[in-house]
Amino acid sequence: MSNKKADSKPQSRYPVNLLDTPFPMRGDLPKREPQWVKEWQERKVYETIRAASKGRKKFILHDGPPYANGDIHLGHAVNKILKDMIVKARNLAGFDAVYVPGWDCHGMPIEIQIEKQFGKSLPAAEVMQKARAYATEQIEKQKVGFRRLGVLGDWDNPYKTMNFTNEAGEIRALAKIMEKGYVFRGLKPVNWCFDCGSALAEAEVEYKDKTDPTIDVLFSFAEPEKTAQAFGLNALPRNEGGIVIWTTTPWTIPANQALNLHPEIVYALVDTSRGLLILAQERVEACLKQYGLEGTIVATTPGAKLVNLRFNHPLASAHPSYKRTSPVYLGDYVTTESGTGVVHSSPAYGVEDFVSCKAHGMSDSDIINPVMGDGRYIESLALFGGLSIWAANPQIVEALQGAGTLMRTENYTHSYMHCWRHKTPIIYRATSQWFAGMDVKPNDTDRTLRETALEGIENTAFYPAWGKQRLFSMIANRPDWTLSRQRQWGVPMAFFVHKETGELHPRTLELLEEVAQRVEKAGIEAWQSLDPRELLGDEANMYEKNRDTLDVWFDSGTTHWHVLRGSHKDELQFPADLYLEGSDQHRGWFHSSLLTASMLDGRPPYNALLTHGFTVDGEGRKMSKSLGNGIDPHEVANRLGAEIIRLWIASTDYSGELAISEEILKRVTEGYRRIRNTLRFLLANLSDFDFAQHARPVEDWLEIDRYAVALSANLQNDILSHYEKYEFHPVVAKLQTFCSEDLGGFYLDVLKDRLYTTAADSVARRAAQTALYHIAHGLLRLMAPFLSFTAEEAWKIFEPNSETIFTETYHAFPAVPEAGALLDKWTLLRAARSDVTKALEEARVANLIGSSLQAEVEIRASGARYDALTSLGDDLKFVLITSAASVVKVDSEAEEGVEVIASKYLKCERCWHYRADVGANAEHPTLCGRCFSNLFGNGETRSAA
């Protein structure tokens, strides 16, 4: 290390070994960090790490790609820094831990941006061109933000889902799952956003409160004789009345095609002034009260007896086109928790309705589907044609009132599906889409996709463990995956479909490979510009190009295929060791990646999943613009330093919500300063130490040095076990405790006298420095994953010839003989020292002494404490930082205690100890004998401290 002594202070006649270091007390992080970012970039530090790690066992943390749109926010910072800490910790643990960042580039948000800037009438080719340019610009902006946070990775060669190689890889992945038999086309209700004009993935749906009119509606008897028989009656007392349903979606009434009852629920035939009403028996009292009616139950029967009975559509008298009947089907999903116990079924607009009607033989062509993709009814729909469904709600209520079939209406606030992009309500809408079948058995295994995925979850490690059940439940209960989207900026489902039959071309798999080869050279634009005749020849007139694009979750969900084993196969590998994202990704990237890998490989693409929580303010509130409680990581980095953000993340239990506020950041900053001060002390007191020249073997060390190194080695083992389990907050807590209590509050405090006052090249001082050298080596490496800037800054002073701390591995501490016994002994000694410190403080408050060195102490001790204290001999006073110390043996703990007296001797000018031999040498009347020996003689001898 460079020897930089403090030359600004006047030289004392009796100098001490007070050294300095270029490592400043003030971090000045906002100024210094960008310099390190620049240096790491210019010196290609990431590439240096890769070269140093070559040949080691790989550790692959596969980056879940953020979307290439907008500035990075605090959630991005949490995610990327957690990944960075893990990758750095694994590199230091001796792995070749590669980090290739990625970006998700296709999809609606970018397409919306292009529409906003250039309108909706751009030709497809221009949309593609501008979308690529926009995504590239956003990626470069985000890249700068991530680098500023100290995240090291292959920033010059990231993966992008819009790279031609990756787009082609997705098409090949699609071909593979088609070849295995997972993909089918069908009419099904899917999440549909009117603003997107497209189907949505489950992960693109969020729930917010919405107020709608609820209605109780009467479907009048169409088969009174059969109804009477079902209730065990010869005839109905009268034919007026019918069955009553309750719904929160009046707009679905025009498309009603069935009624659902639970087979085991008991239904009552109730005589009222509005006629005979069929209601679930459990709901009769509540419903009649709501309708303002009184009634008598005439008969009861289980739902199973009412199956296939028919009732008239409630708008039959309002317009002839509604003169149809709705049959009763049975459904286990019907409950009596609310409503009437009868569910009206519009198969085009409900998954359960659809499944029920299909199970009872309804064909796709029979399904009534009057709502268009923009949310308006088709013009030909009687009474409501051309209206948006939301605008039609009150008109439908009015029409039912006029038809005499409205029993009741009121406004109802409920949690309802919304598009996560547009924040507008969405619906289930039956459309012809391409699906991956969850319960399809492919042609290469007898297990369904659902079964394969669930088995994969069982074989995956989860951090924290609760993530397992969450993902398991989602997979167990999810519907088929809607793969297709109706947009432009996305990877095409590059099929040729027969114009008359709708069938795929018989050479579809071969054609997909042909398209993939073109896309690999020219991007997805190659499909847009492709003339079918190029691939189909004379058959081209019979086929049309499928216009659907792949769900963007298929883009990112297949990165294990087109990145790990595609664009970056030389750096990465399959399966990844770890996927790490926020808890929302159980229904997002974790989910889609599991499904695609289960289809392609029969196993998950990851060995472990790590989930982190979301950021909240100091009061636990979600951050939002309306509350004004958002914190910008860029602003914090420029004001306090990215290191403070990193330390905050590392010190917070990420398995729950991560709370942040100015007060929290203030506490983190104070903690950072304590760590920095510890490093400064270590570096300053090692600035005249050259390991090759000055290091002393363990047998030359004083006992307290051996203890400190054994304690450091124990700490390292403890911390490495936490790193192994991706637990960072215990690492920070233990390092901070070590710095403030074990080092600052004890070892370094005791060491100052030896470092400053013994001869510069004495065995005692060099032994202390050797211990400090090992402690510094260990400490810097242990903190490097989270305090990356600070560790690198200190490292370049500590080991100036080393390229970077990140090519190192964790320090190999020298073995300390009988370390366990030593640790136990010094635990006793430190407890005794705490008692002495307390007694000294009481003496100071009583004005008996000033500093602790003005004191002489007598300790009464018994048993093991007595043995430990007396074993230190004359060095005990150094451990206690007093001028003298003696130990008196007593028989029991009850008799133990500490007596403090003020020393009657003079104070040494140099070491500040009060000693009888101060002035013993006439030529140096202000020196004690110890300092005289250290300066002019052979030096004092120490054994313990």
Curated annotation (Swiss-Prot):
Annotated binding of ATP, by residue: 625
Keyword terms, alphabetized: Aminoacyl-tRNA synthetase, ATP-binding, Cytoplasm, Ligase, Metal-binding, Nucleotide-binding, Protein biosynthesis, Zinc
GO cellular-component term (any): cytosol
Keyword ATP-binding in record: yes
Location, primary (coarse class): cytoplasm
Motif mapping: 'KMSKS' region: 622-626
SUPFAM superfamilies: Anticodon-binding domain of a subclass of class I aminoacyl-tRNA synthetases, Nucleotidylyl transferase, ValRS/IleRS/LeuRS editing domain
Cofactor(s) needed: Zn(2+)
Enzyme class: ligase
Catalytic reaction annotation: tRNA(Ile) + L-isoleucine + ATP = L-isoleucyl-tRNA(Ile) + AMP + diphosphate
Cofactor detail note: Binds 1 zinc ion per subunit.
GO MF assignments: aminoacyl-tRNA deacylase activity; ATP binding; isoleucine-tRNA ligase activity; tRNA binding; zinc ion binding
Compartment(s) of residence: Cytoplasm
Motif 'HIGH' region positions after renumbering to this chain: 66-76
Domain of life: Bacteria
GO biological process terms held by the UniProt record: isoleucyl-tRNA aminoacylation
Pfam family membership, one: zf-FPG_IleRS
EC number: 6.1.1.5
Positions with a binding annotation for L-isoleucyl-5'-AMP: 581
UniProt-annotated binding residues for Zn(2+): 908, 911, 928, 931
Function recorded in the entry: Catalyzes the attachment of isoleucine to tRNA(Ile). As IleRS can inadvertently accommodate and process structurally similar amino acids such as valine, to avoid such errors it has two additional distinct tRNA(Ile)-dependent editing activities. One activity is designated as 'pretransfer' editing and involves the hydrolysis of activated Val-AMP. The other activity is designated 'posttransfer' editing and involves deacylation of mischarged Val-tRNA(Ile).
Domain notes: IleRS has two distinct active sites: one for aminoacylation and one for editing. The misactivated valine is translocated from the active site to the editing site, which sterically excludes the correctly activated isoleucine. The single editing site contains two valyl binding pockets, one specific for each substrate (Val-AMP or Val-tRNA(Ile)).
Subunit: Monomer.
Family: Belongs to the class-I aminoacyl-tRNA synthetase family. IleS type 1 subfamily.
Name of the protein this chain belongs to: Isoleucine--tRNA ligase
UniProt source species: Paraburkholderia xenovorans (strain LB400)
Gene: ileS
